[in-house]
Amino acid sequence: MAPAAASLTAPNALAATSLPFLHGRKSGGGGVSVHAGAPSPSRAVAVVARRLWGSASSSRRMVVAAATAAEMAPAASGEEGKPFVEEMRAVAMRLHTKDQAKEGEKEPQAPPVARWEPSVDGYLRFLVDSKLVFETLETIVDRAAVPWYAEFRNTGLERSEQLKKDLEWFKEQGHTIPEPSAPGTTYASYLEELAEKDSQAFICHFYNVYFAHTAGGRMIGKKVSENILNKKELEFYKWEGNLSQLLQNVRNKLNEVASSWTREEKDHCLDETEKSFSYSGDLLRHIFT
């Protein structure tokens, strides 16, 4: 979504890669254009996640939210009838801090980037859990228990094969590849559950996981690569073809699918945003803990 500088706080960067959010569009010069989306007037986005995650949960949400502000494509004004993807971006903006986006409502809770101490072991845990999540999303749309899931097959955004190659590379370097951990298995199980019984909530996660990775996720990948991988660019951060067009194709499909939803169904999808932030934040924490 000349690029505006992202706030250099830990939540900013972490949010960037957060599998949910960070919905960027490339500008003509190759950068990411930055505009905050206006939220739908009906959204009171203090949203639904009623699980008692306490302060840790709040911290996870901040980690995920951060870089979205630097990567968000422009959203229309709050009038009814605008493309639904823009409503999804607008809701995500509300989970930012004020210094990240004018619509932000959260307090900053993470240390500055200078205090980051990423490790290869932690990054491997993140990659392994991310691979499981992407595999789960790909399996769900391939299986298409809900017929319109098939619209999201072979979008060009799929990441599991790229992650498989990256993990093979780490193995060749002598690193032990861990098994998926609780954050990854828990999120994958939740996605499977949603896919069967709550298609609107599922599509919220689908959208945020993929769009977050193409924007803020790359920011985090670059930072980690510079710190611990001697600037090696992983396959996880490479796409075939025109990424901007791949993203626009998915936006169009999402808007088309949502055009048949009731207002209640759309709101239910939007209400899942905070959970998406939280689950993705759990994965990101691997990198810095």
From Swiss-Prot:
Domain of life (superkingdom): Eukaryota
Reactions it catalyzes: heme b + 3 reduced [NADPH--hemoprotein reductase] + 3 O2 = biliverdin IXalpha + CO + Fe(2+) + 3 oxidized [NADPH--hemoprotein reductase] + 3 H2O + H(+)
GO biological process: heme oxidation; inflorescence development; photoperiodism; photoperiodism, flowering; photosynthesis
Keyword Iron part of the UniProt annotation: yes
CDD domains: HemeO
Keywords attached to this entry: Chloroplast, Heme, Iron, Metal-binding, Oxidoreductase, Photosynthesis, Plastid, Transit peptide
EC number(s) from the headed UniProt entry: 1.14.14.18
Binding residues annotated for heme b, in chain numbering: 96
Listed InterPro entries: Haem_Oase, Haem_Oase-like, Haem_Oase-like_multi-hlx, Haem_Oase_decyc_pln
Span of chain positions assigned to the transit peptide in the UniProt entry: 1-64
Localization annotation: Plastid, Chloroplast
GO MF: heme oxygenase (decyclizing) activity; metal ion binding
GO cellular component, one term: chloroplast
PANTHER family for this protein: HEME OXYGENASE 1, CHLOROPLASTIC-RELATED
Function as written in the Swiss-Prot or TrEMBL entry: Catalyzes the opening of the heme ring to form the open-chain tetrapyrrole biliverdin IX with the release of iron and carbon monoxide (CO). Is a key enzyme in the synthesis of the chromophore of the phytochrome family of plant photoreceptors. Essential for photoperiod response and repression of flowering through cytochromes that inhibit flowering by affecting both HD1 and EHD1 flowering pathways.
Name this protein carries in UniProt: Heme oxygenase 1, chloroplastic
Originating species: Oryza sativa subsp. japonica (Rice)
